[in-house]
């Protein structure tokens, strides 16, 4: 037992030292002129990621379902300094639409350097699983299969540029969470697919990178509306989150945790003390507001 405690303390000290003393810095000029496709970018985190790339002078293409909001975001991207800003309305519940978006991005941008997969949907409400298969199928299609379809359709262009894939995942893709069974399943699938793909790139000596962003509760309008009265957690800033995601993408880091101290300790302790982790996380839910 003493050995286990010593090991855990050593790991904690190591991660604390890494977190506070890491010196990696992002060269913003390296992004100027790069070609970026960002999905789910009419609002929330995707919108903020688009603005971060715009500030660095990238060519940007954004996509979501709502055309008017896409137009507004594209206009703001140009004001912030984007080299160009394109948009296309699309429903990621249709895999043919996902394929078309990737192909259109490659044509309009003249290639692709960053593929940022951020959209979510189809997983139903926040509550107990009652046997309904529609949310399972919907979530699998939108939150997993469309990501793979976009990657497949953009792969040749990314190979040509030795580009980067950025996957917005969740703590729910590392630790099973109640009330979001369909969503959790899709995020676990993402983690498996893209960690495997990253290894394949490495074995081929490819310079292509895969960055998985493992996120907690972020203060996007959709997230707050869906779970704001059902959890006792404080939502983290979407602007700060976007900056960290883009930094990780530019530095080609394999993964990022945000907020770091709200997620990383639980992921580390999950296998050692699963019961304790579950009890701590379960206390975050306001059960009387969940059906």
From Swiss-Prot:
EC class of the enzyme, as a word: oxidoreductase
Instruction: Tell me which Pfam families the record gives.
Output: adh_short
Q: Which cysteines are joined by disulfide bonds?
A: none
User: Can you state which reaction this protein catalyses?
Assistant: cortisone + NADPH + H(+) = cortisol + NADP(+)
Under the heading CDD domains, the entry gives: 11beta-HSD1_like_SDR_c
> Which keywords label this protein?
NADP, Oxidoreductase, Secreted, Signal
Q: Which domain of life is it from?
A: Eukaryota
**Positions bound to substrate:** 170
The protein's location, in the record's own words, is:
Secreted
InterPro entries from the UniProt entry: 11-beta-HSD, NAD(P)-bd_dom_sf, Sc_DH/Rdtase_CS, SDR_fam
| Annotated Gene Ontology cellular component terms | extracellular region; intracellular membrane-bounded organelle
Signal peptide per UniProt: 1-17
Indicate the residues that form the catalytic site.
Answer: 183 (proton acceptor)
Q: Which GO terms describe its molecular function?
A: oxidoreductase activity
Report the EC number(s), separated by commas if there are several.
1.1.1.-
Q: Where does NADP(+) bind?
A: 40-66, 91-92, 118-120, 183-187, 216-222
Q: Could you say which protein family the record assigns here?
A: Belongs to the short-chain dehydrogenases/reductases (SDR) family.
What is this protein's function per UniProt? Answer: Unidirectional NADP(+)-dependent cortisol dehydrogenase (in vitro).
Q: What is this protein called?
A: Hydroxysteroid 11-beta-dehydrogenase 1-like protein B
Q: Which organism is it from?
A: Xenopus laevis
Organism lineage string: Eukaryota, Metazoa, Chordata, Craniata, Vertebrata
In the UniProt record, the gene name given for this protein reads: hsd11b1l-b
């Amino acid at each position: 037992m003493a050995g286990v405690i010593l090991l855990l303390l050593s790991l904690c000290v190591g991660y604390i030292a890494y977190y506070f003393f890491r010196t990696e810095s992002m060269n913003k000029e390296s992004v100027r002129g790069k070609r970026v496709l960002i999905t789910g970018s009419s609002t929330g985190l995707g919108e903020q990621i688009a603005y971060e790339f715009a500030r660095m002078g990238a060519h940007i293409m954004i996509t979501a379902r709502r055309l008017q909001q896409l137009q507004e975001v594209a206009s703001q991207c140009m004001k912030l300094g984007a080299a160009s800003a394109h948009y296309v309305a699309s429903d990621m519940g249709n895999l043919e639409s996902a394929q078309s978006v990737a192909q259109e991005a490659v044509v309009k941008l003249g290639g692709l350097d960053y593929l940022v997969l951020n959209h979510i949907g189809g997983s139903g409400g926040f509550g107990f699983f009652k046997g309904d298969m529609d949310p399972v199928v919907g979530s699998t299609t939108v939150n997993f299969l469309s990501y793979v379809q976009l990657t497949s359709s953009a792969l040749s262009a990314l190979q040509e540029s030795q580009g980067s894939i950025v996957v917005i995942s969740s703590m729910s893709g590392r630790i099973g969470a109640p009330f979001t069974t369909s969503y959790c399943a899709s995020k676990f699938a993402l983690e498996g697919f893209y960690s495997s793909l990253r290894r394949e790139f490495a074995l081929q000596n490819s310079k292509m990178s895969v960055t998985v962003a493992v996120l907690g509760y972020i203060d996007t309008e959709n997230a707050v509306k869906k779970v704001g009265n059902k959890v006792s957690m404080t939502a983290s800033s979407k602007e700060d989150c976007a900056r960290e995601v883009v930094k990780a993408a530019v530095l080609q880091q394999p993964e990022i945790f945000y907020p770091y101290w709200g997620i990383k300790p639980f992921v580390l302790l999950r296998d050692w003390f699963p019961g304790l982790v579950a009890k701590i996380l379960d206390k975050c839910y306001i059960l009387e507001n969940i059906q």
